[in-house]
Amino acid sequence: MTINPVSRKVAWLRVVTLAIAAFIFNTTEFVPVGLLSDIAESFHMQTAQVGIMLTIYAWVVAVMSLPFMLLTSQMERRKLLICLFVLFIASHVLSFLAWNFTVLVISRIGIAFAHAIFWSITASLAIRLAPAGKRAQALSLIATGTALAMVLGLPIGRVVGQYFGWRTTFFAIGMGALITLLCLIKLLPKLPSEHSGSLKSLPLLFRRPALMSLYVLTVVVVTAHYTAYSYIEPFVQNVAGLSANFATVLLLILGGAGIIGSLVFGKLGNRHASSLVSIAIALLVICLLLLLPAANSEAHLAILSIFWGIAIMVIGLGMQVKVLALAPDATDVAMALFSGIFNIGIGAGALVGNQVSLHWSMSAIGYIGAIPACAALVWAVLIFRKWPVTLEEQPH
C-alpha cells in the first residue's frame, strides 16, 4: 500500500509534525528527572521515593509496547495517532490535577500507554511519509525531536516547574500535545497499516541471533545510563552541593551535547554504526566513573556532561538503525520490542539508582552505573565483530 504522491514540502511537513510529536512524548518521559525534588517536596516525600515513578512509567511501556502494537496492528494509523493523543492529553490534565502521589502515578500510567503505541509505530511512519529516497533523513529528524526533548524540553520543563510549579509543566505539555494533534489531523492522510507484522513474525525475529544480541546490549547499556541519569538533579544539589539553577544548566548541556551526537551519527552512522556505538559505550563508562570525582567543580561536571550527552545519543541512534536494518520485514514488531526493551533498561536503571540512593549513598550512582556499562562494552565489541550491519539508504 502506498500513499498518494504529494509535494516534497507537504511530505517534509508531515515528518516535521511527527518529529514535534516525538519531542513532546520524550519531553514528558524525561521531564520528571528534572522535577523529582519539587514533586517530592509537594507530597512531603523523599526524592528517591518519588523516583519510583520513573520505573513504573518505563516498565508499563516495556510490558505494554508489544501487546498494544499487536492489538492495533490492523488499525488505520491516522486514527490510531488521534486516539493515543487524546489519551495522552487527558492523562496530562490528570497529572495537573493530581491531589496525591497515587493519582499522579495513575496519570503517568495513562501517558505510558500512549507512549507504548506511539514509539512502536513512529519510525516506520516517518519512513512512509518521507519524500522518496529520504528515509534516513526522516529518521534523523525524528531523532532530532528526541534530542531536542533533552536539550529544550527537559530544561524548560524544569524552569517552568521551578517558577510556576511542576503541575504547570505537565499542563503545558498537554496543551502542546493538543496543538500537535490538530496539526496531525490537518496534515496526515489515511495511513493503512503495513509491514506491522503479527505474532507470527515473533518467532522469526527471535531466530535472528544478531537482533537478540542487540536487544541484550540495549537493556544493559540503558540500565547503566539511567542508574545515574535518573538522579542527576538531586545528585547535583545534594551530593555536589551546587545550586538548583546549575542543575538546570547541566541538564541543558547534557541535552545540547545530544544534538552534537545526532549530527556526528548523521554523518558517519550509515557506514560506521558499530564502531561509533562501541566508542560511545566506552565514553559512557568513563563518564560514569568520573561523575563523583567531577562533582567538586561546576566546570568539570559541565565538561563531563558534554561527553556523556554525545555518547548516549550515539548509542540510542545506533541501536535504532541496527534494529531497523535487521528487521525490515517487521519494523513495527521489532521497534515495539526495542521500545519495550529500552524501557526495561530505563526502569531498571531508575530502580537501581533508587535503591542505591535509599540504602547506600546517592554519591555512588556513577560507580554502580559503570558496572553494567563495562559489561555492555565487552558485549558490544563481541557482537559487532560477529554481526556487522548497516542501514543502507533505499528509495521507496
Swiss-Prot record:
Segments crossing the lipid bilayer: 15-35, 50-70, 81-101, 103-123, 136-156, 169-189, 209-229, 246-266, 275-295, 301-321, 333-353, 364-384
Subcellular localization: Cell inner membrane
Cellular component per GO, a single term: plasma membrane
Protein's membrane topology: Multi-pass membrane protein
Main location: membrane
InterPro entries tied to this protein: MFS, MFS_dom, MFS_Efflux_Transporters, MFS_trans_sf, Sugar_effux_transptr_put
Molecular function terms, GO-annotated: carbohydrate transmembrane transporter activity
Keyword terms: Cell inner membrane, Cell membrane, Membrane, Sugar transport, Transmembrane, Transmembrane helix, Transport
One Pfam family linked to the record: MFS_1
General function of this protein: Involved in the efflux of sugars. The physiological role may be the reduction of the intracellular concentration of toxic sugars or sugar metabolites.
Stated family: Belongs to the major facilitator superfamily. SotB (TC 2.A.1.2) family.
Protein name: Probable sugar efflux transporter
